[in-house]
């Protein structure tokens, strides 16, 4: 009713970019890539106390159904090709959240010969969530930041 009072003509005007981004913003489907203890906090964020479903986040079991990858934990050299392969299987548009110090830059194992010093060397990362391990609140804040980033992006190519 409040909307009808504001819109006297009975219609809403918007751009296609805003409409598309609004739908993408409210329906992120992450594919979890849990590698270490950060994955426990990611599961905690999806449980009943924090309930990521209220933000439109629904965890999917397949990369072909996902548009968001959450890399949580230490990425080893042997796991890096698998990470890239799963990322390549995701449809466009796709986003990546790097969760935890180990995924961000190697963390405690930074000087180890077998650790990739940041998953951004393998896949492009949109949001970094710091912490060891980051709390569920930090992951939720990262998801909210990603939603605002999606709302600002242009989805339709404009010709000059």
Swiss-Prot record:
Keywords: 4Fe-4S, Cell membrane, Iron, Iron-sulfur, Membrane, Metal-binding, NAD, Quinone, Translocase, Transport, Ubiquinone. GO terms for biological process: aerobic respiration; electron transport coupled proton transport. Its main location: membrane. Its EC number is 7.1.1.-. GO terms for molecular function: 4 iron, 4 sulfur cluster binding; iron ion binding; NADH dehydrogenase (ubiquinone) activity; NADH:ubiquinone reductase (non-electrogenic) activity; quinone binding. It comes from the Bacteria. [4Fe-4S] cluster binds at residues 37-38, 102, 132. GO terms for cellular component: plasma membrane; respiratory chain complex I. It is a peripheral membrane protein. Binds 1 [4Fe-4S] cluster. It is an enzyme of class 7 (translocase). Its cofactor is [4Fe-4S] cluster. It is found in: Cell membrane. Signal peptide: none annotated. InterPro entries: NADH_UbQ_OxRdtase-like_20kDa, NADH_UQ_OxRdtase_20Kd_su. The keyword Cell membrane applies. It catalyses: a quinone + NADH + 5 H(+)(in) = a quinol + NAD(+) + 4 H(+)(out). PROSITE patterns: COMPLEX1_20K. PANTHER family: NADH DEHYDROGENASE (PTHR11995), NADH DEHYDROGENASE [UBIQUINONE] IRON-SULFUR PROTEIN 7, MITOCHONDRIAL (PTHR11995:SF14). NDH-1 shuttles electrons from NADH, via FMN and iron-sulfur (Fe-S) centers, to quinones in the respiratory chain. Couples the redox reaction to proton translocation (for every two electrons transferred, four hydrogen ions are translocated across the cytoplasmic membrane), and thus conserves the redox energy in a proton gradient. Belongs to the complex I 20 kDa subunit family. HAMAP family: NDH1_NuoB (MF_01356). NDH-1 is composed of 14 different subunits. Subunits NuoB, C, D, E, F, and G constitute the peripheral sector of the complex. This is NADH-quinone oxidoreductase subunit B. It comes from Polynucleobacter asymbioticus (strain DSM 18221 / CIP 109841 / QLW-P1DMWA-1). The lineage of its organism: Bacteria, Pseudomonadati, Pseudomonadota, Betaproteobacteria, Burkholderiales.
């Amino acid at each position: 009713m409040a909307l009808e009072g504001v819109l006297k003509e009975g219609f809403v005007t918007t751009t296609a970019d805003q409409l598309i981004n609004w739908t993408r913003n409210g329906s992120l489907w992450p594919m979890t890539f849990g590698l270490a203890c950060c994955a426990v906090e990611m599961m905690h964020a999806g449980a009943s106390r924090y309930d990521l479903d209220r933000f439109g986040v629904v965890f999917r079991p397949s990369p072909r159904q996902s548009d968001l990858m959450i890399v949580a934990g230490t990425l080893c050299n042997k796991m890096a090709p698998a990470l890239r392969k799963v990322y390549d299987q995701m449809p466009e548009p796709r986003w990546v959240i790097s969760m935890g110090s180990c995924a961000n830059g190697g963390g405690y194992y930074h000087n180890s010969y077998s650790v990739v010093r940041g998953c951004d060397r393998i896949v492009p990362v949109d949001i970094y969530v710091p912490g060891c391990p980051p709390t569920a609140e930090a992951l939720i804040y990262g998801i909210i930041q990603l939603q605002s980033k999606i709302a600002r992006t242009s989805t339709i190519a404009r010709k000059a």
